[in-house]
Amino acid sequence: MIDLTNCNLCPHRCSVNREQGQLGFCHLDAGLHIANISLHTGEEPIDGSENGVCNVFFSHCNLRCVYCQNYQISQPQSVVKHEITDYESAVNQIVAILQKNVNFLGFVSPTSHIPHMLKIIDMVQKYGFSPKIIYNTNGYENVETLRLLEGIVDIYLPDFKYADDELAQRLSGIPNYTETALAAIGEMYRQKKSVLNDENPA
């Protein structure tokens, strides 16, 4: 059971009570916040998703990248139009895409939303679908949180944004990115025991 009354899902370790509406770095309460669900055909080809990926784009983020291409949905001040806030609507949209012979379900910027991600996966499976799960992350993750996903996530798709902590602080507003992300990627590798690349596709 993931405790959002003392949220430490990500390396910020804000320890806020999201169930009572307290906001940490990501500015998320305990509710479901999905900006978009869509069929995405531009994913990295090595994941083997020839028919595309059903991507769930969560709102908000645990980084503050000044160059973010999704800034309309990722920033604390973002007001997301038509945000999906109930599970049934989300799962119905996902199932409608999976029915089109789509075998991959991706979660984008899922770190602060892991309890919701897990519930969605469970509901999708109860509909009779077993897509491969892609965890698409900025790399700023807690190892202990990633361990909760062992056996659930099929493909980790991390960024490694910085090898320079000064740049990470200046451009994304986060401390100690390099060591934190390397430890997280190491845990992902421990779980999956292989790296997907052009020579070793899914």
Region roles according to the model:
Residues 91-202:
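Conserved AdoMet/S-adenosylmethionine-binding subsite of the radical SAM
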Residues 66-70, 77-82, 117-120, 145-146:
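Short, conserved acidic/polar surface loops in the N-terminal third of protein domains
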Residues 56, 81-88:
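Residues at secondary-structure transition points
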Residues 75-84, 104-109:
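Glycine-rich phosphate-binding "P-loop"
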